[in-house]
């Protein structure tokens, strides 16, 4: 029977979820993950513990619009209309309530600590049995690894406790509540709590029991906490594993602790001691604690490059050796410190190749499983990332174990963000909110501090800078002086951070915002008195078709030692799968669930799609972050390793010399490069060239053998150099046949053999081509100066809030999208060996000329049409997105073949990873399926393009697909695109960069803007 004090009415009256001073009731203290092995060998080998039982699976569930709607009877028995849901899960992914995507704006009315009366409430219940032996002795705990956002727990009708902080565990002692036979849990989860004001991260707002639930049985006398640290001499040849162990229960003289250190099957060191430690103050020391030090000679050091893992087993036993219980953790011998303005790992300065990562799955919301976690780690390792920031909350506990073992440096971040407050530090400078903030920081440290992968603590994200931050910074530095602390809020260089950690600071451009100026990263280093390292906590906003200018950051990182890298925003698009009326899946973003407020597609900033398929930008990141750098001098290649600890032992350098994509010579050389060392490779003499073209040398570093994170044949680095400037685009000598010109009132028509070209005299455009009786064009060949806007072009502009500074708004206001061609000249001349068409167009909007385009088309007896284009840009119009030509071809061919940069999509400010070669891909692969459609699929540096019966030659950029720029511009989601008739071809003489320093302000560097007043390009169009 439910007691009065346990009743739902009492809980509702207290309203713990609207009291920042109440963050938990009856919750146990935080500690590292426990398993309570009763066999030390099982602890050493990390076998499943018989004392740890998962409660994941099917639970009964009922959703209510508010906690007051929950009937009291639910505490005792399931309701008749209960459904079944799987735990862990977000209830929004099961059709209850709607997920809300918002970045800054709170999804609730801002009135802390109060939340809406209509507060969606999920009521979970589970019936289970426990082992009889668990009831006879010891302590049985229930562990919730993550519940969003707050919950009350009952067991067998009796109230157990309360917890909040969605991203850290809540653990309760169930011993007094369990009974023999059947037991029933009831968990009331509230969508909103006062904790929601500290959880205003840029992500989907979801609810429920979304991480694992488990039971743990501990002995009455037990290990209650343990902490390991590694200490070194100056040259890292000797180490001490320092283990501090705390117990709970009856403190008996016969109790002992043994800590043993293992490397595989080999015991490296061991030590035993009774409880009781050093004197702390005049009252003595801790009787329930003991610290042991194990000496280790020549430890194998841990790093992301070589993640050597030991295993520490902590045994609580009696003096005669009878084991009471054992706990264990992985150990990595490594040292992190900041010295002389540099972040050092094991004495070496790190270069952080980092990425931010939200816990996100397109089908499961914020539920992470081991397969997805491993998939993400493999993606990072294979693409030369060595670090991850847990943005913006502590991750699933398993994540850290996997990072330890695969090798990633981790920034562990507290679940604190108050981005929507005005000012942002309104709560973080308020002492009433210090207890809530404190629990989120201190419990993170207590849970995760044994992980070697965690090299930096973060106090949270975008919460201004308040006195609470200063207090928590000092707490961490006192409790764990072995790691630096970072925090970006309040200007990225406050007293609460050991690292200057700005977000979206640019390489050379200052952003002098009031109170919190964002200096260029180069300038920041030179500020008076500033000696901290700089690591960007967020940079290179990878939203849609982005990451332009990424190479500029890496040039700076390699030039200035104290610029120690950064974390790209971010890894994974946060789109969610919805289904149409026919059951077909499609990718949804903010607003697609009827969610308000929402920030539309701003949730999709990933280097990979939500299903982990890579964006083309991922290849650029991989190339810029590669650990081998190359320098060519004559026939000598100098290979420099940026590895700090890895001596190349599984790398071959493959080299190829090719002329217009045709290999002339190749070879391979084993790499034997010491960490931070060099190797010089001499190439043989090249064969004599007997034809013209572009000569390129390409090198790839290939791993012949599989590793823990890559398959055999993995390419880790590459570089390419052009060896000769001998491209010839001159036309062949005059042919024997002469094309025939026919003039009518409406057209100029040129005929040659079975080919015809028709120019409309009223429009001045090439209106049709024939090969035999087959028409080749569905639309005329026209100038093109616009592109379907990128996310970076749109910025923060939207229908209800126009940003006049956004590129797309500037183009719209100037009339670029609405411009119409006025024909100024259209003439035809018969030459000795060719026909020459000359046209001049003025592209105008509302009587104003924006562009003047002068073109000549020279059709000779070989059937080649040489097109020369000269464009004048009005001085007072915005720089255009592109200067090129477009038409709709009648054919739909299966494949596209080109000689140029590829194979992936590339743009003028994102092409360092692309290689010059002859590429051949299916037409469908020339389109990049960004969830929010935009300009995509460009290939730069093209010398030859072949599609169907057509060939284009010159020096141009192109994209080709079934979708017009107009359709891409007008369509909100990729699944709504329809393949149009024929194929759309865009050939650009010049294309503006895409930017990517951020996505809310113009970020295309000046050198990649089309700022000149005149442009000239030419190409040849012929039929094969």
Swiss-Prot record:
Entry keywords, A to Z: Glycosidase, Hydrolase, Magnesium, Metal-binding, Sodium
Residues the entry annotates as binding Mg(2+) 2: 598
Cofactors demanded by this protein: Mg(2+); Na(+)
Keyword Hydrolase: yes
Reaction(s) the record says it catalyses: Hydrolysis of terminal non-reducing beta-D-galactose residues in beta-D-galactosides
Cofactor info, note text: Binds 2 magnesium ions per monomer. Binds 1 sodium ion per monomer.
Superkingdom as given in the UniProt entry: Bacteria
GO cellular component, one term: beta-galactosidase complex
One term of GO molecular function: beta-galactosidase activity
UniProt GO BP: lactose catabolic process
EC number: 3.2.1.23
Keyword Magnesium belongs to the record: yes
Active site: 462 (proton donor), 538 (nucleophile)
Residues bound to Na(+): 202, 602, 605
Record-linked Pfam families: Bgal_small_N (PF02929), Glyco_hydro_2 (PF00703), Glyco_hydro_2_C (PF02836), Glyco_hydro_2_N (PF02837), LacZ_4 (PF16353)
Residues with site note (Transition state stabilizer): 358, 392
Enzyme class: hydrolase
Sites where the protein binds Mg(2+) 1: 417, 419, 462
Protein name per the record: Beta-galactosidase
Gene label: lacZ
